[in-house]
Every structure is written in structure tokens, then in C-alpha cells.
Amino acid sequence: MSENVMTLQVITPAGVVYDHHANYITARTTNGEIGILPNMISTIAGLEIDELKVRRPDDETHVDYIAVNGGIIEIKDSLVTIVADSAERNRDIDVSRAERAKIRAEKALEVAKAEKKSDEIKRVEVALHRALNRLNVSSHN
């Protein structure tokens, strides 16, 4: 493999979501956004609910977008592995389902706030964040 190429694998309990070569990856960790290049220093970090951007070596003008709902990222030599609870490529996102999830979460958030249930508010805010992330990533089609 070329020195300017790395392999990215995104894995969920349902299986491998993404397995391709890349020459640049952007991810949001719990400590902020990072840009990943081939042969970077080894790192392990927690991931936020956010989009993952992947620039592939076969078409540098094209970016693959993946909705990642938290997890961990490990960078070692020319292999980047992401293990996430769930992840979807932008082309695989069911937009109407994501819209319905957003509406459900917004309604549940109103109820939880009215009832002042702090644990429920946090849970529903995460669900809303996931739905908004999926909608944002799907807009890159």
C-alpha cells in the first residue's frame, strides 16, 4: 500500500458499514475535531455523534459522508478502525425515517421538559442529536 493511503473500517454490531482506502479523514472526537492522515501517531479516542468525512484516493474531489453515533476510533499505522453503536453512509440513510425520529424526539423532549425529568431529557436529547446528524449527513447526497 502507498505511504499516502490508509484503510478505514467502520464497524457496528450489525457488521461492517465501510471498508475503503482513504487519504484524509475528518472525525469529531470527545476532545474536538481531528484530521487524520496516513501514518499518523497511534491514537485511541472517543467519538461524538457527528459526521465522518472520508476523502478517497481514487477521486480526491469526492467525499464520502458517514453518520456515526458515537463510539471509539483507533488509529494505528495505516489502519483507522471505528467501532460504533450505529453508523450509516449518506446514501443508505432513510430520510423519511430520520425525519420521523426527529419529530418523535422533539415531542418527547417537550414532554420531558414539562415533567422536569432530567434523565429523560438527556436521553431524548441524544435521540434528537442522532436524528439531526442522520438528516445532516443525508443532505450530502
UniProtKB/Swiss-Prot annotation:
One MF term in the entry's GO annotations: ATP binding
Membrane topology annotation: Peripheral membrane protein
Keyword Cell membrane on entry: yes
InterPro entries, per database record: ATP_synth_F1_dsu/esu (IPR001469), ATP_synth_F1_dsu/esu_N (IPR020546), ATP_synth_F1_esu_C (IPR020547), ATPsynth_dsu/esu_N (IPR036771)
Keyword Transport annotated: yes
Pfam families hit by this protein: ATP-synt_DE, ATP-synt_DE_N
Subcellular location: Cell membrane
Domain of life: Bacteria
Keywords annotated in UniProt: ATP synthesis, Cell membrane, CF(1), Hydrogen ion transport, Ion transport, Membrane, Transport
One cellular component term from this protein's GO annotations in UniProt: proton-transporting ATP synthase complex
Subunit structure: F-type ATPases have 2 components, CF(1) - the catalytic core - and CF(0) - the membrane proton channel. CF(1) has five subunits: alpha(3), beta(3), gamma(1), delta(1), epsilon(1). CF(0) has three main subunits: a, b and c.
PANTHER family, A to Z: ATP SYNTHASE DELTA/EPSILON CHAIN, ATP SYNTHASE EPSILON CHAIN, CHLOROPLASTIC
Job of this protein: Produces ATP from ADP in the presence of a proton gradient across the membrane.
Sequence similarity: Belongs to the ATPase epsilon chain family.
Name of the featured protein: ATP synthase epsilon chain
Protein species of origin: Lactococcus lactis subsp. cremoris (strain SK11)
Gene: atpC
